[in-house]
Amino acid sequence: MTYLLSPDEVAAAYVELRTRVVALLREAGEGVADTPVPHCPAWTVKMVASHLLGLPEDSLGGIKPGDDLDAWTQAQVDRHRNDSLMSILDAWEKMGTTIDPILPHFPVPMNSQFVFDACTHEHDIRAAIGKVGARDSQAVRVAAGFIRNSLSLLPQPEAQELLRVTISDFDFLRSLSGRRSVEQIAERG
């Protein structure tokens, strides 16, 4: 059984997510750029936006994370260190003309992992700036499906047990992406 959505659904979810996050941050304004993002210690909203831009930049540029994920993501942040938040959003939006047509052709499940990462950070930003929303978006469904699919491939009984948990896709995503404490997870069942 696969929990993954179709490549076209995954691609559409990413386009919707990017459009939503760009609009959210444009409305919030440059003033939120230096807002700390509690779920990404040592990162600000601008740094998370730099990573969101860096993902498609690196995908198109053939830059792979290698063994050091922290160095890879830090390079994305460093690349845009001197850019304003608004210029990062402009570049991310413009990137759509190049990446959107090829998204449906990304390898499975890498395409869903791409959306999983972006969706996780959308909600990190939302939490940081106090703008809850998009908890039932297609991107959340893609991200939760990616996690469930990954769990389904593991032989451990605990992984299989997690597949039977009946919480919202949003809570499943936040719990299994390290954004919930043990107490918060217990409260949700």
How should these model regions be labeled?
Residues 1-12, 32-41, 64-74, 94, ...:
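Structured surface interface patches that mediate subunit assembly and partner/cofactor docking
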Residues 78-95:
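A short, structured beta-strand-centered segment in the mid-to-C-terminal lobe
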